[in-house]
Each structure stands twice: as structure tokens, then as C-alpha cells.
């Protein structure tokens, strides 16, 4: 059995700060029971040991909150994107269905999550992603442009976090994708600041 997932003291502090920040930033767009339902879902995922660190040792709940902060502050998305980001690990790992998301949070977050799952399937079928053909496939599979915006934000978040990580092989792979896939997508969508940051971080 896998070790029980635990937050470090620093992660707990940052998580609380990010939740407070997101609440103050997008609170007006949240529906009455959004936060309560999300808290229950995340608490259950911890209780049933459904949360695991990624290949870089990063905390997925904290990573989701960091990505959510980027999509809110640097791209301008709000409630539906944030909910989709925070629920994505549970849905991707099979602990929650798209139908449950639709029932609890509405059609819009469910639509974004459906697009994110389609992209995951596309990745599994295409080991080589550094091509214009794959970028075009990505755009068509996403269905909703918010999916691509979230993916760009998540890659920016990951690149910021792993610049000093010792897993050189995984870091190199992520950097290659940032330079050849996500930076061109960011440019195409007019996210020039994020595009430049992706290019800069991919060289480090």
C-alpha cells in the first residue's frame, strides 16, 4: 500500500494562502455551495489516499491552486476554469466522473474537463508532440479554447517549479514540450508574456 499523502508545513501554508487569494479574486463568480462541495471532494481524495506526488515530487493539490492563480491573474479566466483545474486529478484518475462534475458544478466545468481528458488521450497516442501537426490536433481535440489556456498556464506553473529540480531527464522532456508546443500556442493566442517566459525557462 502506498504511503499516506501528507502536506509539508510550507505546502500547507502556501495552500491556505492560495485558497484565500482565489476566494478574494473570484469569490463573486462562485455559486453558493461551490467551495463546500469542492472541499468535500478534496478531503475525500486525501482520506482515501487518492493523492500522490508527481514525478518531480510536487504536491498535486498545491500545483492545481498555483495553476488556477495563473489562469485567473494572467489570463483572466474565472470560476469554471478554476473548478476544472482543481477537479481534474480526481476525474483523470477515475475517482470522479464527468457526469458527477456536471451534476455538482454545472455544464461549463464539465465541458472543460472533457476537453482536458481528450487531450490526455491524445498525448498517449502521440509520443512525439514537437510538431505543428500535433499542435493542430491539440487545438481540434480541445473543443473549448479554455482547455488550451489552462494547459499553457499549467505548463508555465510546472516550468517555474522545476527549474532547479534534479530529475534531469524529465525536466528536459518538459522543457522541450514548453519550447516546441506550448510557447507557439501561447504566441498564437496572444499570450506573449507567458510565451516569453516559457521560452526563457526552457533554456535553463
Regions found by a protein language model. Give the residues of each.
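Active-site helical microenvironments for divalent-metal-assisted chemistry
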Residues: 1-204
Amino acid at each position: 500500500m502506498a504511503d499516506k499523502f501528507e502536506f509539508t508545513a510550507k505546502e500547507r501554508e502556501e495552500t491556505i494562502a492560495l485558497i484565500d487569494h482565489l476566494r478574494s479574486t473570484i469569490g463573486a463568480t462562485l455559486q453558493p455551495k461551490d467551495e463546500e462541495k469542492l472541499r468535500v471532494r478534496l478531503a475525500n481524495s486525501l482520506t482515501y489516499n487518492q493523492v500522490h506526488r508527481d514525478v518531480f515530487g510536487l504536491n498535486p493539490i498545491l500545483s492545481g491552486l498555483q495553476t488556477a492563480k495563473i489562469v485567473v491573474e494572467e489570463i483572466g479566466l474565472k470560476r469554471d476554469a478554476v473548478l476544472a483545474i482543481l477537479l481534474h486529478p480526481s476525474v483523470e484518475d477515475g475517482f470522479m466522473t464527468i457526469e458527477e462534475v456536471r451534476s455538482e458544478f454545472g455544464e461549463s466545468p464539465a465541458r472543460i474537463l472533457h476537453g482536458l481528458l481528450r487531450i490526455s488521450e491524445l498525448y498517449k497516442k502521440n509520443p512525439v508532440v514537437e510538431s505543428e501537426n500535433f499542435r493542430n490536433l491539440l487545438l481540434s481535440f480541445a473543443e473549448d479554447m479554455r482547455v488550451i489556456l489552462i494547459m499553457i498556464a499549467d505548463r508555465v506553473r510546472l516550468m517555474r517549479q522545476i527549474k532547479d529540480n534534479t530529475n534531469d531527464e524529465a525536466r528536459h522532456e518538459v522543457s522541450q514540450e514548453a519550447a516546441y508546443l506550448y510557447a507557439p500556442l501561447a504566441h498564437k493566442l496572444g499570450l506573449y508574456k507567458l510565451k516569453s517566459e516559457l521560452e526563457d525557462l526552457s533554456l535553463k
